[in-house]
């Protein structure tokens, strides 16, 4: 299995307030059970990104807090896996998607995770407590050197 040298900190483009981006040095996240740490190689800018920067999604509570790392269309490489991960290994090339459903509701079980029934259920964080992640919107995104994905 390939091993990668992972630094303690990384550079990330953070949204610190509406219309204010700042390049920051932040800790590299550690993958938990069922998660992978990816080295981000490229990130696209989606039409939703400028709108979020300029405050166009206040009604949806995007971003949920500051500083926030945006970015949900990316490609990279797995550099470390968390406990229980069997489908990926360090060195695998990957591309990301914005949504990870809860895996428990009827829609997720049918493979329709982008319409997860637990998304946004609590009205504040997109359903994180129910297992749903929306990277770059409610959960830290890929405008950084590394990120953890489920």
Enumerate the predicted regions with their spans.
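Short N-terminal binding/cap micro-motifs at the start of the first secondary-structure element
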Residues: 19-23, 47-48
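A secondary-structure boundary/capping signal
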Residues: 17, 39-41, 150
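Glycine-rich beta-strand-centered segment in the early N-terminal region that forms part
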Residues: 27-43, 57-109, 114
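Basic/polar N-terminal segments that are highly enriched at the extreme N-terminus
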Residues: 1-11
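Generic structural detector for well-ordered beta-strands
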Residues: 25-27, 148
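Cytochrome P450 core scaffold surrounding the K-helix E-X-X-R motif
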Residues: 48-54
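NAD(P)H dinucleotide-binding glycine-rich loop of Rossmann-like/cofactor-binding domains
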Residues: 102-150
């Amino acid at each position: 299995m390939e091993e990668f040298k992972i630094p303690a900190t990384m550079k990330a483009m953070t949204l610190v307030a509406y219309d204010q981006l700042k390049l920051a040095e932040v800790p590299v996240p550690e993958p938990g059970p069922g998660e992978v740490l990816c080295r981000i190689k490229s990130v696209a800018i989606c039409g939703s990104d400028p709108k979020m920067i300029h405050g166009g999604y206040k009604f949806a509570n995007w971003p949920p807090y500051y500083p926030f790392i945006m970015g949900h269309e990316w490609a990279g490489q797995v550099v470390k896996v968390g406990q229980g991960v069997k489908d990926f290994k360090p060195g695998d090339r990957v591309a990301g998607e914005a949504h990870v459903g809860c895996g428990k509701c009827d829609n997720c079980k049918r493979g329709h995770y982008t319409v997860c029934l637990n998304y946004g259920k609590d009205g504040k964080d997109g359903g994180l407590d129910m297992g749903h992640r929306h990277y770059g919107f409610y959960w830290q995104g890929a405008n950084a050197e590394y990120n953890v994905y489920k």
